[in-house]
Amino acid sequence: MKRITVTKFGLLSGGLMFAGGLIFAGGTQDDNPPRVAQVVALDECDPVTFNAALGPDFCKNVTIGAFTKLTDLFAKAQAGTPDPGWDFEPDTLHIQKGTDLVVVDQGGEPHTFTEVAQFGGGFLPVLNAPGEETIPECAGGFSNVAVARTRILQGSQDHITGLSKGEHLFQCCIHPWMRVKVEVK
């Protein structure tokens, strides 16, 4: 009985040493761990005016002492000078093929992160620059499932994987001046 236990212990120890050797030799480690790049959605919505017009808790202001009233946001967009407090950061991103994008909404209201063929107007004409039409990828707003899938809510994130080599353009279909160009090498 004692001999069987010693034999089993020896086999177990040998197996563990072999497995440990594989790990240190890289036999079970991923030689190319996934790469991640982050894009952050920002805004400065004023909870009082946004929530009065759009419903309770639509805007959860996250800025300290800086906010934009809903009417001011509309006026700036209509004048062709959209509010710079609504932004994707960075504006341009250079990544390697296989890199995952993590898009985080650190603003106070929802956004979309929609891939588009070319930049243009979103689905809310009041927020489009003068003469700017809604682009096909944003048409229909959230009733279009393709647009709804790209929505990111306050405090949430989305993961974009499998981008091919080349240039990829993303914009918010609500606030169309929020734009990012991603170059995949």
Residue ranges and their predicted role:
Residues M1-V6:
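N-terminal secretory signal peptides that target proteins for export/translocation
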